[in-house]
UniProtKB/Swiss-Prot annotation:
It catalyses: (S)-lactate(in) + H(+)(in) = (S)-lactate(out) + H(+)(out); formate(in) + H(+)(in) = formate(out) + H(+)(out); pyruvate(out) + H(+)(out) = pyruvate(in) + H(+)(in); acetate(out) + H(+)(out) = acetate(in) + H(+)(in). One of its GO terms (molecular function) is high-affinity secondary active nitrite transmembrane transporter activity. This is Formate-nitrite transporter 3. The chain crosses the membrane at residues 32-52, 70-90, 114-134, 165-185, 193-213, 238-258. The keyword Transferase does not apply. GO terms for biological process: nitrite transport. Signal peptide: none annotated. Keywords: Cell membrane, Membrane, Transmembrane, Transmembrane helix. Residues 1-31, 91-113, 186-192, 259-500 are cytoplasmic. Residues 411-500 are annotated as: Disordered. Monocarboxylate-proton symporter; active in acidic-to-neutral pH range. Transports L-lactate and formate.
Length: 500
């Protein structure tokens, strides 16, 4: 079993949630119905097993309540295994994933509401179908032992106070969302099964309240005539359980880990081997570009609106051959308050010209897919074939990883703990255009070299508007002065004779 580290798992959770918004409503609803059916089928199997064991002390073969509860819990994870591996939509897990995407501005509130409503109603319909067609009509649970078990379970669930039921539901969906997190972080089937099994068993043994499981159990009890009544079930169980599940998934898991990891750069480059940068590793390249975007490259992104420079379409990869404009020299609104001399000073301030080609990437529209361009040899711009999901920022083409080893003199490095956020350093693989495949020497066939690998890397820096660690009070003038001093020192070190 291979588990991704927490930041990587968080990135996967975001991508997992974004994919849910791509589903058509009819398919979303159908998958939600199937999830409800899977929960109902597992609930039927658990009830058939646990109800077959008596807890009456007068019975010599009686088992304890704890044993009966564990028998029920041991089979219930089968429902979640079916849901994960078939791609069905379970409302309780969606509370976490969709909220994280909403807080990251990857989905709209409307998309979240559509997903929640469709998945909840579909889960209810699926659980109702399973309770009637798979449990009630076959008559498997109509013997006295199973009816007595159903009656006890229904009575216990509806005798709880509103606060008790709410708190039990909070704990339940915390376990469920952690199971979803573990599954997303796992890379193999066995790891997914093992990582989800124990949280699901735990919430069943703990007696927590799961709204979809209660849909099946209480509706099944009502159909068999051992339930307390429809109104009592809705008011005493369904409503507090639903609210508690939402609070548990959104509050104790989704919002907490969004706060811990936000912002995360989810730029998925066409890379052979992603190389994560150490948070504390000195990197003047990373820092200078982060400072640049911090002061002059912000985007005031609002839901449904992309506040981007005029060349945003090119920067977003819409053109495969035309080179994007250099963000350091752009004349758009993001850099309008910068004089030509200041822009030149910033460009020269990057040690060794390591990041001469910096691209301002606009925040993607909701759904978040764009193709960030990469550069191979000089003048050869292209876009990777794999879609990337990102929050916008500055993409910098770095000619050599050695450029990242210089020590930063930026004031932001001293005043902020981790100003670079979740950066990814990836080796780029560049596809040459058809015009560039023409033979450079006589005797070679046209198109003989369709691909070339270039030892180049791409940095992605998130905008400061969505970064809690970079202080906003740093003055532009002080940064420009620091950058000019750094540029002069660098020039003196590289060309000492020029000062004579």
């Amino acid at each position: 079993m291979v588990l991704a580290a927490s930041p990587e798992a968080y990135r996967k959770v975001i991508e997992y949630g974004i994919k849910k918004t791509k589903l058509r409503i009819d398919r979303l609803f159908l998958q939600a119905i199937m999830a409800g059916i899977y929960v109902g089928m597992a609930g039927h199997a658990c009830t058939a097993l646990a109800g077959a064991y008596s807890t009456d002390p007068a019975n010599p073969l009686a088992v304890s309540k704890a044993t009966q509860k564990f028998l029920y819990a041991s089979l219930f994870p089968v429902a979640f295994i079916a849901i994960i591996f078939t791609g069905a939509e379970l409302f309780t897990g969606n509370t976490m994933t969709m909220l994280v995407c909403l807080l990251e501005r990857r989905v709209t509130a409307l998309q979240l509401c559509i997903n929640w409503i469709c998945s909840l109603v579909g889960n209810w319909a699926g659980a109702l179908f399973a309770a009637y067609f798979l449990s009630y009509l076959p008559g498997v649970l109509q013997d006295p032992d199973h009816l007595h078990y159903l009656e006890d379970v229904a009575a216990h669930k509806t005798e709880l106070s509103f606060l008790q039921c709410f708190c039990l539901a909070v704990g339940c969906n915390t376990f469920v969302c952690l199971a979803v997190w573990f599954v997303i972080a796992s890379d193999d089937a066995a790891g997914k099964i093992m990582s989800m099994w124990f949280p699901i068993v735990s919430f069943c043994v703990a007696g927590y309240e799961h709204i979809i499981a209660n849909f099946y159990t209480l509706q099944c009890a009502l159909m068999h005539g051992v339930g307390p009544g429809v109104g009592t079930v809705i008011l005493k169980n369904f409503i507090p359980t639903l609210l508690g599940n939402i609070v548990g998934g959104c509050g104790l898991v989704g919002a907490v880990y969004w706060y811990n990891f936000y912002p995360t750069v989810c730029v998925v480059q066409e890379a052979r081997q992603p190389l994560p940068l150490s948070e504390n590793a000195p990197s003047s390249t990373r820092q200078v570009v982060a400072d640049l975007f911090s002061l002059w490259g912000r985007e005031s992104s609002t839901p449904g609106v992309s506040a981007s420079p005029p060349d945003a379409a090119t920067n977003a990869g819409c053109s495969a051959l035309d080179p994007p404009r250099n963000a350091l020299l752009a004349a758009g609104k993001n850099f309008g308050n910068l004089s030509a001399g200041d822009r030149g000073a910033l460009a020269e301030g990057i040690p060794g010209g390591a990041c001469e080609d910096c691209l301002l990437v606009p925040r993607a529209s909701f759904g978040g897919e764009y193709h960030p361009p990469q550069q191979g040899d000089a003048g050869r711009w292209c876009k990777p074939s794999k879609a990337a999901v990102g929050s916008g920022g500055v993409l910098c083409h770095v000619q050599s990883p050695a450029a990242l080893e210089a020590v930063s003199n930026s004031p932001l490095r001293e005043n902020s703990g981790v100003p670079s956020g979740g950066l990814l350093l990836c080796e780029g693989r560049v596809r040459r255009s058809s015009r560039e495949r023409e033979p450079e020497r006589g005797g070679e066939e046209e198109g003989a070299s369709p691909e070339e690998d270039h030892p180049a890397v791409t940095l992605s820096i998130p905008p400061t508007d969505f970064h809690p660690h970079v202080p906003r009070e740093v003055e532009q003038s002080s940064l420009l002065e620091e950058t000019r001093v750094a540029a002069e020192n660098s020039a003196l070190e590289e060309h000492p004779a020029s000062t004579i």
